[in-house]
Regions:
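Intrinsically disordered, low-complexity boundary segments flanking structured domains
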Residues: 11, 59-65
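A short beta-strand-turn-helix
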Residues: 23-41
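Bacterial Sec-dependent N-terminal signal peptides
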Residues: 1-21
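A conditional alpha-helix N-cap/helix-loop micro-motif detector
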Residues: 20-24, 91
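Hydrophobic beta-strand anchors of alpha/beta hydrolase catalytic cores
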Residues: 41-43, 50, 75, 111
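C-terminal partner/receptor-binding element of secreted or periplasmic proteins
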Residues: 147-174
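Thioredoxin-like thiol-disulfide oxidoreductase module
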Residues: 28-31, 63-66, 70-152
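Conserved redox-active cysteine motifs that mediate thiol-disulfide chemistry
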Residues: 45-60
């Protein structure tokens, strides 16, 4: 009986510890790491069903791309908008963060960049005529990729050659 009780207690403890972290906890961890490493934070909202989210992750994690992003950013993900059977994957509070940054109106992936203190730098809503416009998400068209490069130039130490490599790679997303 004690053995079964021990197993039950262990399972409850494991289940409690395995809960999806809150959006606040994810962002605090990323900011602490960015502060320690002298980087900015790149936050991407995604979901398990989102093909464009997977495409963006794949592009950013390719062997030629990953070092360019990782030397400049702590990249973190917040899961939102999951289907009914996968709501457990969502980070509690991530929907509120998405809305706070205006990403709740344009689909995912939605991303934004902050400095290590959480000060906003830029997001995935392109600027048209001096105003925020639609979400470029995973950049693929010439205009979307140009905007992505603008954000990277503004928020990183990437040089022109590195930015050209990133541009060429993301244009392959079409």
């Amino acid at each position: 009986m004690k053995f079964l009780l021990s197993i039950g207690l262990a399972l409850v403890t494991f289940t409690l510890n395995a809960q999806t972290p809150t959006a606040a906890a994810v962002l605090e961890k990323a900011q602490a790491e960015a502060k320690a490493d002298g980087k900015n934070v790149f936050v991407m909202f995604h979901a398990s069903w989102c093909g464009w989210c997977h495409k963006m992750d794949k592009a950013m994690n390719e062997p030629d791309m990953k070092p360019l992003f990782e030397k400049n950013y702590v990249i973190t993900h917040l899961t939102v908008l999951e289907s009914e059977g996968k709501k457990n994957l969502e980070n509690p509070g991530a929907d509120k963060v998405l809305a706070q940054y205006g990403g709740d109106k344009g689909g995912i992936p939605f991303w934004y960049v902050t400095d290590a203190d959480g000060k906003f730098i830029e997001d995935s809503r392109a600027i048209v005529d001096g105003k925020k416009a639609g979400n470029v998400g995973c950049p693929a068209t010439e205009k979307e990729v140009d905007y992505f490069i603008y954000v990277l130039r503004k928020s990183s130490g990437l040089n022109d050659s590195e930015l050209a490599e990133i541009k060429a790679r993301f244009l392959k997303n079409q």
